A protein has these predicted regions:
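Helix N-cap at the beta1-alpha1 junction of Rossmann-like dinucleotide-binding domains, i.e.
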Residues: 34-36
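FAD-binding core/adjacent interface of flavoenzyme oxidoreductases
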Residues: 1-7, 23, 74-141
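Alpha-helical scaffold segments in soluble metabolic enzymes
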Residues: 19, 62, 66, 102, ...
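Rossmann-like dinucleotide/flavin-binding elements
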Residues: 1-2, 6-32, 123, 129-171
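A short local structural element in Rossmann-fold oxidoreductases
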Residues: 39-40, 115
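N-terminal Rossmann-like dinucleotide/flavin-binding domain of flavoprotein oxidoreductases
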Residues: 40-97
């Protein structure tokens, strides 16, 4: 029986994996994609203390290596079900069922896409989902903000300090 299964190998999951395995726990981490989560689609990270501007995938790989450096294991695949039996949990995948004392869910977020042609290819190359993260790359340029509710307004207000807002649109009307 494992001590901990972590579902999600983005920055939060990898950090938890590092700390838990370093503390001597028997840890298994799952993800259905490459470790690193959103870092893998971030062209450049400029706002991480202690690092010079670095490509997101490079940081993701370094985090992955660190997370596994104390003996944790990684499995690729989708978790289909979690069953709680009180003293232990079962984590069910297509390949196998695992028993563990604890489960940590660190699956992150997924932005709602606009269904534009080639949208996936343009993420990190013109399409961004984080004004604070990527706004400085577009300083003094005209940008569009498309979103819903308060978050779109907050992003637009922040970007207005750096960029010219050519268009701000609520997703429901796009």
């Amino acid at each position: 029986m494992l001590d901990l299964i972590i579902i999600g190998a983005g920055p939060a999951g990898l950090s938890a994996c590092l700390y838990a395995s370093r503390a001597g726990l028997d840890v298994l981490i799952f993800d259905s994609a490459a470790p690193g989560g959103k870092l893998n689609v971030t062209a450049q990270i400029e706002n991480y203390p202690g690092l010079k501007p670095t490509p997101g995938p490079e940081i993701a790989f370094t985090m992955y290596e660190s997370a596994l450096s104390f003996g944790a294991k990684m499995e690729y695949g989708e978790v289909l079900n979690i069953k709680d039996y009180g003293d232990y949990k079962e984590v069910v995948t297509a390949k196998q069922t695992y028993q563990t004392k604890y489960v940590l869910i660190a699956t992150g977020t997924k932005e709602r896409q606009m269904n534009l042609e080639k949208e996936n290819e343009l993420v990190g190359r013109g399409i961004s989902y984080c004004a604070v993260c990527d706004g400085p790359f577009f300083k003094n340029q005209e940008v569009a903000v498309i979103g819903g509710g308060n978050s779109a307004l907050e992003e637009a207000m922040y970007l207005e300090t750096l960029c010219k807002i050519g268009r701000a649109s609520c997703r429901e009307r796009v």
